Amino acid sequence: MSGEIERSQEVAVIFAQDTDHKAQYEALAKLCNKYLPQNAMGRVDTAEIIKIIDTVIALETGSMVVSRQFVSLITERLDNQHLESECVKAISEGILAIIKTRTISYEDQVCILRLMLASLYEKEGRIKDAAQALIAINSDTSPKFNGPQAAKEGAKAQLCIRITKLLLDCSEIDEAEQYVNRTSILMVDLGANPDIQIEHKALQARVSDAKRRFVEAAQRYYELSATEQLPNSDKLTALGKAIVCVLLAKPGPQRSRLLTLIFKDERAPKCASFELIAKMYLTKVIHKDELEEFEHQLQDHQKADEHGESILKGVIQEHNITAISQLYINISFKTLGQLLGVDTEAAESMAGEMISSERLHGYIDQTNGILHFEDSNPMRVWDSQILSTLEQINKVSDMIVARHSEFAEFLT
């Protein structure tokens, strides 16, 4: 306690002895040298430094010119790789706590301290704390993120990108989406900056993937795989992720279009899951043992939906029903269940849901427990209807000839 009083008195004397801001700052800088010299190494007395800063800010009234300069000096000296990170962290957190209610007067210093803390937290694996440190920066008013040079470098967009990455890494997906959307707005003013654009596209894909919007994610990953600036290895990685997402996506026109694009892409056979893409595109039955390797590639959010149901299992079962419809005119639900690896009731429920949503053409004979398939190809349906009509005409003609033999001469 006596040390704190002594330090407070020392700072008070500096302010009392001279009213000149320059002289006050120089005297405080000398005091700072005792506890936090330039190029300091190892540990420093964090408690003393924080007390000095607290006293300086508390005693100075009016313009706060000296206290701002002094906090800037401390901030500069904290940016020193030879200082123990725990000391840097403690002093930075201490300063932020002291000026919490006066942040607007120390915006530049606060910004630098938060950036410093974010890097330290990230190294320690405190990903969420790192994200929160960056989120607390007011990039709209902070000098570091405004002005011609900051605009040219896309400083605000880069900050949002960094925040998005951290939020994704700590599974704060909804908040990550907010920042990826904010980056999209900033990109309009930023113009063509290929590096930032690529990072942004990759994060858009990751957010869509994490939100289980797999068709959208597949589309973004595929676009990324065609980006000229990326090395071939990164292009293939993006293509592989597009394949994973399209395999997990629900059926629909956009998914069908992506399946076609990927299947016909000459790079696709180099990807691990190409055989599954081929079977899905060609509407062939996919067996359980063919999925083992693919399942190992899946991330946690790709394995189950929000209800805990397997995403892959549902998609593959639906695909297999469609594939079976190409092989059978009709099938019992018992046999269908055996082919799908589910019980009879589940097979009937799946088929019924697909028919009701027009993802499968057919009808259910509940009395006999049979699923009847109808051809969804309009030309084949048209041909079938013509053939059926002609067969009926022939049948009627034969019946007429059987009763009235003279009609045969008319037909010939």
Swiss-Prot record:
Checking SMART domains in the record gives: PINT
Q: Kindly list the biological process annotations in GO that this record carries.
A: cell cycle switching; oogenesis; regulation of oogenesis
Q: Taking every annotated instance into account, which residue ranges of this chain make up the domain PCI?
A: 216-378
Q: Looking at the UniProt record for this protein, which Gene Ontology cellular component terms does it annotate, in alphabetical order?
A: COP9 signalosome; cytoplasm; nucleus
Primary localisation category: cytoplasm
Protein's name in the database: COP9 signalosome complex subunit 4
The alphabetized UniProt keywords are: Cytoplasm, Developmental protein, Differentiation, Nucleus, Oogenesis, Signalosome
Which Gene3D superfamilies does this entry report, sorted A to Z? Winged helix-like DNA-binding domain superfamily/Winged helix DNA-binding domain
Family the UniProt entry places it in: Belongs to the CSN4 family.
